[in-house]
Design a protein with these regions (language model features):
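Residues embedded in well-ordered secondary-structure elements
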Residues: 2, 11-12, 53, 64
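A short acidic-Thr-Gly-centered motif at the start of a beta-strand
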Residues: 8-20
Length: 129
């Protein structure tokens, strides 16, 4: 899908049967979720963001469904203010940031001496003329 940025890009994700809302965050390296129980082993990790550093549990090879697309990757679980899907999973989804096509550049044209540009037929005008 194409998502505009007039609102936060929040999507529904499914992690181990648990439905959550998460923010698609191209500025985040990692995916961080809170209040979620994941099976398997985890490793402790510290991550830093604008709000400082937080301690998280790192789970590898986690299956997540994002907007109906299944991906497998590393998920960090900890006290994040908002669940974020970082670049580690966005790249697997094939997400890209696209900028609109820039305005068409004009090319200056040199006219032959004595020419004052192209002649354009005048459209029919009403009484004002």
């Amino acid at each position: 899908p194409q998502i505009t940025l007039w609102q936060r890009p929040l999507v529904t994700i499914n992690v181990g049967g648990q439905l959550k809302e998460a923010l698609l965050d191209t500025g985040a390296d990692d995916t961080v979720l809170e209040d979620i129980e994941l099976p398997g082993k985890w490793r402790p990790k510290m991550i830093g963001g604008i709000g400082g550093f937080i301690k998280v549990k790192q789970y590898d090879q986690v299956s997540i469904e994002i907007c109906g697309h299944k991906v497998i990757g590393t998920v960090l679980v900890g006290p994040t203010p908002v669940n974020i899907i970082g670049r580690n999973l966005l790249t697997q989804l094939g997400c890209t940031l696209n900028f609109p096509i820039s305005p068409i550049e004009t090319v200056p044209v040199k006219l032959k001496p004595g020419m004052d540009g192209p002649r354009v037929k005048q459209w029919p005008l009403t009484e004002e003329k």
